[in-house]
Swiss-Prot record:
Protein name, entry field: UPF0251 protein Teth514_1147
InterPro entries associated with the record: RNA_pol_sigma_r3/r4-like, UPF0251, WH-like_DNA-bd_sf
Family: Belongs to the UPF0251 family.
Amino acid sequence: MPRPPKCRWVRSEPNVTHFKPVGVPMSMLDEVILTVEELEAIRLKDLEGLEQEECADMMKVSRPTFFRIINSARQKVADALVNGKAIRVEGGNYRVYEEEQRGHRGMRHRHGH
C-alpha cells in the first residue's frame, strides 16, 4: 500500500484560477488542470528565480519531489500554450502559510481533488 502524499507548503491561494485563449468560448476549449502546488513551484522557480533546493525547502518536500512537481507543471503549461487549451488551477495536497491578524504565522490545510 503506497504511503499517503505529504502536504506541500504554498504562500497563498491563487487569486486567479482560470486562463484561456482570447476569443474562444470555454465550451470550445480543452482544459489543463494545474494543482496549487504546481503553480507554487512555477512561482518559486521560474518567477522568483530560486534554486531547486531552496524551492524544495520552502515547499517542505524533497528535491526529487520538487523536480517532479515543477516538471509536471511546466509540461501542463506548455501543452496549454502550444495547443491552445485553457488552464484551471485547483486541487492538490497543500498547506497555506498566512499572516494572521495577531502577527504570528498560521496555516490552513487543504486537500484537493
